A protein has these predicted regions:
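Start-transfer (signal-anchor) and selected internal transmembrane alpha helices
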Residues: 1-29, 64-104, 128-186
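Membrane-interface alpha helices of multi-pass inner-membrane proteins
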Residues: 347-362, 374, 399-401
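Transmembrane signal-anchor helices characteristic of membrane glycosylation enzymes that use polyprenol
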Residues: 18-38, 101-113, 171-198, 399-411
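Extracytoplasmic catalytic/substrate-binding loops of multi-pass membrane glycan-assembly enzymes
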Residues: 193-206, 214-230, 237-242
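Transmembrane-helix motifs of polytopic, lipid-linked glycan transferases
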Residues: 249-270
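Short acidic/glycine- and proline-prone juxtamembrane loop motifs at membrane-interface regions
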Residues: 291-301, 361
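Membrane-proximal stem/loop segments at transmembrane-domain junctions that anchor or position
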Residues: 415-550
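Membrane-interface anchor segments at the N-terminal boundary of transmembrane helices
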Residues: 57-73, 242-246, 511-605
Length: 606
């Protein structure tokens, strides 16, 4: 205490004032809005005094009614910044200031898009330039504190030592103990949303599979086949509800198993108990896990595969020679606990299964796998020095998921005569940019360019079809007949980009701005099995399928979804259910890895 008192007294007044100003700016960043009202007419002719008058009036209106909150937050930030930046400074990490500024700039841009779907709101009216600077500096300081504080927490040796009697069961059966807990916690969600929550894509998949619509590759054909098979089984035994619920149960069992496996692996890595317990709580409570368990979308099984495969990548990188085919004398780095003694062949099996689900359930899965596998192959060649057999076996393992998934897709395609869909999904990004350009700068487009765009998209209706948050309305108008029309279109696309590059940046940023905004999300919870049924209502397909909610559960799905929305608004739990939180955490962890490993073992950054 005496040393800390001395440290406080040695902090200069200049530093204290600087910290106070930073705390005040951070407080303003949390409380200001981009809406700026016009001040009352004052009939001031002196430009300098008029500027000061408007500045004072607009600043006053920006913080009006928030005096008590601003005082409390400023005091809180002042002592937090003073303690962690000056009195007991946290560890500085190379690049942490740049990362925190990146986060704050992305957040400020997101605020602009949330306000009026444009970056112009950050500069117009001119007073908003000051607000933007406050947002960048204020949130930058806040993010810098969090980055350094989290690094300190992650590297502390302190841990919890619970003495709960039930832990003896966990110690004997760590995987099944966690697995059962997750399933028990999810069961209430599955029951209240029985038989499951549908979407427009799910109804299209069933229409493809049942022959009510052309079976195309617009949806992943394996997931369409798998989902349709469960529903057809339900119809066969007399209840489509049972078929849907069995599929929900199937994907929930898989996800819970993979999540339990992550905690098993974390134990073998000697991850602190508090972090494992926190992770388990997130798995059990956060709507991203519990809520989506009752939603049969393709992304769910994709995440199952991606997560399992990612675990195996990390496990592989921990091995000394980066190979599954070790000699008995070789060891696994840090992997000395009993839970880490998983046979290499089982790791290989998990690698194949995880990669297969990832590739089969989303079209971009194959690109993720191939790019990562090339990196892994380079590691093999660098570390495997002795046996050509190890090289050959490793290459075979890397190739199996590609061959397996290609064979499955080919078999389904041949059996159901699946038609190749147009490349509209691949071009959704440039299509969205073109639509925004037509909306904002349509008067600058020549007649020849209009004709070229019209051969690919519905040019006349693009301004009305353009939606800032989704490319679906625009890309569905794709109708190019040949590659020449596409080539001409992309020539126009490039020319328009050079004319107004900011327009293209805004189109892409506007569609995804929420991924760096921890206080905003675009999460949607489809409530029940009726959602999206209107897609094929005119041909009676919804009646043929016949999903229904039992009378005893009427209103249950709305109730549980309202619970999800309430959790999203809570200060801490809501952030754990926010996509921006996990994306920013990923960037932060990459920074930690780069710092900890410095010039060696950069393969962990994968």
């Amino acid at each position: 205490m005496f040393e800390k008192a001395i440290t406080r007294n040695t902090i200069s007044l200049r530093k204290r004032v600087s910290v106070f100003l930073l705390a005040f700016i951070s407080t303003l960043a949390f409380n200001i809005e981009l809406y700026t009202s016009d001040p009352e007419e004052a009939y001031i002719h002196n430009r300098f005094f008029l500027f000061l008058y408007k500045l004072n009036s607009q600043l006053a209106s920006s913080v009006s009614g928030k005096g008590s909150i601003i005082v409390a937050m400023t005091i809180l930030f002042f002592f937090a910044f003073l303690y962690f930046f000056e009195i007991h400074p946290l560890i500085k990490i190379k690049g942490d200031t740049a990362l925190s500024l990146f986060f704050s700039i992305m957040y400020a841009g997101g605020r602009g898009f949330a306000y009026n779907d444009s970056l112009s709101s950050l500069m117009i009216p001119r007073f908003n330039i000051l607000k933007t600077i406050i947002l960048v500096i204020g949130y930058g300081a806040f993010y810098l504190l969090l980055i350094r504080l989290l690094y300190t927490i992650m590297h502390t040796s302190k841990d919890i030592s619970p003495k709960w009697p039930i832990l003896h069961i966990y110690n004997k059966h760590p995987f099944f103990f966690v697995y059962i807990i997750i399933l028990i916690m999810w069961s209430i969600h599955l029951i209240m949303r029985y038989p499951g929550a549908m979407s427009y894509d799910n109804w299209r998949q069933l229409a493809y599979y049942m022959g009510y619509d052309t079976y195309t590759t617009a949806q992943p054909i394996f997931h369409t086949w798998l989902f349709g098979t469960f529903i057809r089984f339900g119809l066969f035994i007399g209840s489509s509800n049972i078929g849907l619920f069995l599929f929900i149960l199937f994907q929930s069992l898989l996800m819970a198993a993979v999540l339990a496996y992550t905690l098993l692996i974390m134990t073998s890595w000697h991850t602190p108990r508090w972090l494992r317990l926190l992770t388990l709580c997130i798995y059990c409570i956060a709507p991203y896990f519990a809520g989506y368990a009752a939603f049969p979308i393709k992304d769910y099984l994709f995440v199952v595969g991606l997560l399992l495969w990612t675990i195996e990548i990390i496990s592989l990188l921990q091995k000394e020679n980066k190979s599954w085919f070790l000699n008995k004398s070789e060891t696994v780095l840090k992997d000395t606990s009993s839970t880490g003694n998983i046979p290499d062949l089982l790791h290989v099996f998990f690698w194949i299964i995880g990669a297969a689900f990832m590739i089969l359930c989303r079209k971009n899965g194959i690109y993720i796998y191939i790019l990562t596998s090339l990196f892994i192959l380079i590691l093999f060649l660098r570390h495997i020095r002795k046996s050509p057999r190890e090289v050959l076996m490793s290459i075979i393992v890397l190739a199996i998921p590609v061959v397996l998934t290609s064979s499955i897709d080919t078999a389904i395609t041949n059996h159901y005569n699946v038609i190749q869909d147009s490349p509209k999904e691949m071009f959704s990004l440039p299509f969205q940019q073109t639509a925004r350009f037509v909306r904002d700068y349509g008067d600058e487009i020549s007649d020849d360019d209009k004709e070229i765009i019209s051969k690919v998209l519905d040019y006349d209706n693009l301004p009305e079809l353009y939606s800032e948050m989704t490319a679906d309305p625009v890309k569905t108008t794709y109708h190019a007949q040949n590659n020449r029309e596409l080539y001409d279109y992309f020539s126009v696309w490039l020319k328009e980009f050079l004319q107004h590059p900011l327009c293209y940046i805004e189109a892409t940023w506007n569609q995804n701005y929420y991924i760096f905004m921890p206080d905003m999300d675009n999460v949607v919870y489809n409530q029940d099995c009726y959602f999206g049924s209107a897609t094929y209502q005119d041909i009676g397909f919804d009646k043929y399928i016949g999903f229904y909610i039992p009378s005893a559960l009427e209103g249950a799905s709305q109730t549980i979804c309202s619970w999800y929305k309430m959790l999203n608004e809570l200060p801490i739990i809501g952030r754990l259910n926010n996509v921006a939180f996990y994306i920013m955490l990923m960037f932060t962890v990459l920074l930690y890895l780069k710092h900890d490993f410095q010039k060696k073992n950069h393969e962990y950054l994968i």
